[in-house]
Each structure stands twice: as structure tokens, then as C-alpha cells.
Amino acid sequence: MLIIEVSEIRGKCPVYKKGDKIVIDGPEIVLEKTDAIRIHALAPLLHYVVALRDGVDPRKLGLSKEEDVAYIQCVDPGEPYTEGGTVIFKCYIGE
């Protein structure tokens, strides 16, 4: 399974808090194990989910300096442009 965990929030996010997770098993989001889903977060995540789920090294995708974790951020720029904030997601294979 691919685990997408909120690692950091820069500003304010009305949906996520640090430690929240989205869990993906194959082609499905496992709703019972997922804390929240925000439309702003789906756009950047969906570009990489299949590759990461299938074991592509995040370094080759330019998403990390480490081989077993990727970092992707939400598209909300936060202050002073919006009242929200940027969420940094840590993506890794887990159970």
C-alpha cells in the first residue's frame, strides 16, 4: 500500500492536520484508513501515485534525496495569496 502522510503544514489548512494519512491500495483509496481527502491535494498527488506505488525510486522522479520516501506538496500557496496553506505530504510504501 502507498501511504501519503501529512508531514508539515505551512500556514493553515482547513482539512488536514499533521499525521493525517491517505491510504492507497492498488487503484483504490482505502477510505476506512484515510483521514481526509482534499481536492487541492489530489492534483499533485495523482501524477506520482502509480509510479510510487509500483516502486519507482523517488529520487529518479525528483521527489526526494532518499530512496524510500517521496515529498509532494499541495498547490495552495497560502498567505499572502490565500487564507490556506501549503501541505507537505510524505509518501512511502507501508502496511
What are the language-model segments listed below?
Residues 60-95:
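Short, compact, well-ordered microdomains
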Residues 26-62:
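Acidic, aromatic-enriched beta-alpha/helix-loop junctions
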Residues 1-8:
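Short, structured beta-strand/loop micro-motifs enriched in basic residues and often containing a Trp
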